[in-house]
Regions:
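Hydrophobic packing residues in well-ordered alpha-helices of helical domains and bundles
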Residues: 9, 13-16, 20, 98-105, ...
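Positions in alpha-helical segments
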Residues: 7, 11, 43, 47, ...
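Amphipathic, well-ordered alpha-helical segments in soluble domains
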Residues: 19-26, 55, 108-111, 115, ...
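Short, contiguous alpha-helical
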Residues: 34-84, 118-158
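Alpha-helical bundle segments that constitute or directly flank the non-heme di-iron/ferroxidase center
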Residues: 5-32, 54, 58-65
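Acidic/histidine-rich alpha-helical segments that form the ligand environment
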Residues: 81-122
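Basic/polar N-terminal segments that are highly enriched at the extreme N-terminus
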Residues: 1-7, 157-158
């Protein structure tokens, strides 16, 4: 989509919405076989979608805590091993039908964006924790993976 850097809360949320739509466009026309074919390391597109949903569900509460003026991450929780979290999120949905994983993606996006919208403007500024949480788990994440999916589709003429 675009690499335009958002400067306000509204721009950030709008950018997330645009990249979400672009991510869905990258999936358009793919069938069950395409969605479950492993091609990104050990992952399929279904796994990509599942792990994004996992981050939504994991980081939504962090945004809710920030909106209440609390620390975003509970004591004792670490996200240093992102790959382990990614693997966990993908594995949690591996046995679910593609349609259910896609539905959960839509629901988790809606939940995450609702949590992001509730963060006060003064806490949702470029460079602040809330800003990074929103961008990294929405626009940036959608763009990263939609680009990978589009490249895979081009390589396969899909």
């Amino acid at each position: 989509m675009t690499d335009t850097i958002a400067a306000t809360k509204d721009e950030l949320l709008n950018q997330a919405a645009r990249e979400y739509r672009a991510f869905h466009e990258a999936l358009q026309g793919l069938n069950e076989e395409h969605m479950t074919e492993v091609w990104l390391g050990t992952w399929s597109i279904k796994d990509i979608v599942a792990h994004i949903s996992g981050w939504h569900r994991e980081m939504g509460p962090a945004l809710e805590r920030l909106a209440r003026g609390e620390k975003p991450i509970p004591a004792g929780v670490s996200y240093d091993d992102v790959d382990a979290w990614n693997a966990r999120f993908a594995a949690e949905r591996r046995e679910e039908p593609v349609a259910d994983v896609l539905l959960e993606f839509d629901k988790s996006h809606e939940y995450f964006m609702h949590a992001a919208a509730a963060v006060p403007v003064d806490r949702l500024q470029p460079g602040k924790t809330a800003w990074k949480l929103v961008d990294n788990n929405s626009a940036h994440h959608y763009r990263e993976h939609s680009e990978q999916i589009r490249a895979w589709r081009r390589s396969r003429s899909v």
